[in-house]
Amino acid sequence: MSQSVSERTRIKSDRYESGVIPYAKMGYWDAAYSVKDTDILALFRITPQPGVDPVEAAAAVAGESSTATWTVVWTDLLTACERYRAKAYRVDPVPNATDVYFAFIAYECDLFEEASLSNLTASIIGNVFGFKAISALRLEDMRIPHSYLKTFQGPATGIIVERERLNKYGTPLLGATVKPKLGLSGKNYGRVVYEGLKGGLDFLKDDENINSQPFMRWRERFLNCLEGINRASAATGEVKGSYLNITAATMEEVYKRAEYAKAIGSVVVMIDLVMGYTAIQSIAYWARENDMLLHLHRAGNSTYARQKNHGINFRVICKWMRMSGVDHIHAGTVVGKLEGDPLMIKGFYDILRLTELEVNLPFGIFFEMDWASLRRCMPVASGGIHCGQMHQLIHYLGDDVVLQFGGGTIGHPDGIQAGATANRVALEAMVFSRNEGADYFNNQVGPQILRDAAKTCGPLQTALDLWKDISFNYTSTDTADFAETATANR
C-alpha cells in the first residue's frame, strides 16, 4: 500500500510533532553544551511559578528570548534551527534563597544585528519578562564576545583623553548639579555655574529633568552657562565645563540642541537614559564625530534595576552604555542618598573602568570579558554626598570618578563658591594624605584629616559642622548573593 506524500515527507522526530511540547525537549536545554567564544552569554535570576521545574523555566527563557513560540512550527525546518536556538546550559540555586535559580543561557551571535542595542535588547529583555510560567525574572549579567563588541564604537573620549583635556591626574574630578533643579531663570542658573566653577569645581551640570520649560528655555540656559564657564576659566586658569542637557522629545530637536551647544563653545553635552537605546547610540555617534564629551544621567534606571527579583541589574546597563559610546554615567556613591551596596557599586565601577573583567562573585560579576579595546567610561557619583564623606568616597570609588556635590555645594551657608571651595580643599587634603601613606579610611584618621584642613579653610569647617551628623544608613535592596556587606557608612 503506497504512502501519502505527507506521510513520506514527515520528519520522524518527536521534536517536530505538531502540538505543544516542553521547551527543554524542544532543544532549548542542553546541559552538555560547550560554550563558544563567539556566544553571547546571559545570566538570569529566575523565580518559577509553583510546580514549574527550574530547568524547564530556564529552557522557556532561552526559547522565548530566541526562536521559540508556544507551539511547534514546521517553519523551523527552513532555518538553521539547531544553531539559532538559545541554549540554557546551567541552572544553579541562588544562595540563601528559596525556589530562586540562576540560569545560564548561550545565544548564537548571528541572532543579533551588529552594533544595535535595540536589537540585542529586543530579544534578551523582550516578551520573555512577561512569561506566565515565571513569577519573576531578572537579567543579572551578560558576556558580550569580542567579535560582537568590536561592532560598537564605545566611549568617544574615555577617561584618559578627558584627563588630558583637563590636565588633571591622580585625583577624582569635582562637580555639582545645579539646584534647585527646576525653576531658576537663565541668568540665575548661569550665576550658579560661575560661582561653583570659580570656587574650585571642574564641572557643573544640569539635572535629569531640566530641558526647555516655560521658566527657562534651553537656549537661554546654554548661553548663560557658557558665560559662567568662560568667566570662571579666565579667573582660575583651569579648563571648566558644564553638562548641558540636550534631552528632548525628538531626535531632530536633540541634534539641534547639540549643534548649538557645540557652536557656542561647550565641550560636553548630556542626555538621559530615558531617551532610549537608539537615541543614546545616535547621539553618541554624533559626539564622536564632533569631538564632544557625552554625559549620561541614569534617569529611570531604578524602575527596573533596584528590585532584586525582577528587572535588569544595573551592571548590565553599565555594559550596554559603555558599548553605546557614552563617556560618563552615574553609577552610585555607596554613602549617598541613593541605592548602593558597596560591593555592587564596586562591580559597576569595575565594569566601566577595567579593560578586562574577571569573575568576581562578591561584586556580582559572573563572566570573564575582554572589552576589545573599547575605551573606559568615567563613573559619576552623585546624590546626597558631602565633603565630610571624602575619605569614604575615595576609598570606595578611587580616582577615576566624578564626585558631584549638588546640595553639598549649593547648600553651603556661606554661598555656592564657599561650598565649592570646601569640597576642593577636602578632596586635595585627602588625596595628599593618601599619597603620603596615611590610613585615611580609618574612622578616626579620615575625619581628622578633614578637621586639620579646615583649620585654614573656613568654608570647609562650616560644611563639616553643618553636615557632620548626616548619613544614609539604610539596607540596600540589591545586595551581593555571595558575600555579606557591612553598612556602607560605618
From Swiss-Prot:
E.C. code: 4.1.1.39
Broad class of the protein's primary localization: plastid
GO CC annotation: chloroplast
Subcellular location(s) of the protein: Plastid, Chloroplast
Chemical reaction(s) catalysed: 2 (2R)-3-phosphoglycerate + 2 H(+) = D-ribulose 1,5-bisphosphate + CO2 + H2O; D-ribulose 1,5-bisphosphate + O2 = 2-phosphoglycolate + (2R)-3-phosphoglycerate + 2 H(+)
Residue sites binding substrate per the record: N127, T177, K181, R298, H330, S382
GO process terms (BP): reductive pentose-phosphate cycle
Cofactor note: Binds 1 Mg(2+) ion per subunit.
InterPro entries cross-referenced by the UniProt entry: RuBisCO, RuBisCo_large_chain_AS, RuBisCO_lsu_C, RuBisCO_lsu_C_sf, RuBisCO_lsu_fd_N, RuBisCO_lsu_N_sf, RuBisCO_lsuI
One example GO MF annotation: ribulose-bisphosphate carboxylase activity
Domain of life of the source: Eukaryota
This protein's UniProt keywords: Calvin cycle, Carbon dioxide fixation, Chloroplast, Lyase, Magnesium, Metal-binding, Monooxygenase, Oxidoreductase, Photorespiration, Photosynthesis, Plastid
Annotated family: Belongs to the RuBisCO large chain family. Type I subfamily.
Miscellaneous field: The basic functional RuBisCO is composed of a large chain homodimer in a 'head-to-tail' conformation. In form I RuBisCO this homodimer is arranged in a barrel-like tetramer with the small subunits forming a tetrameric 'cap' on each end of the 'barrel'.
Protein name: Ribulose bisphosphate carboxylase large chain
Organism of derivation: Detonula confervacea
Gene coding for it: rbcL
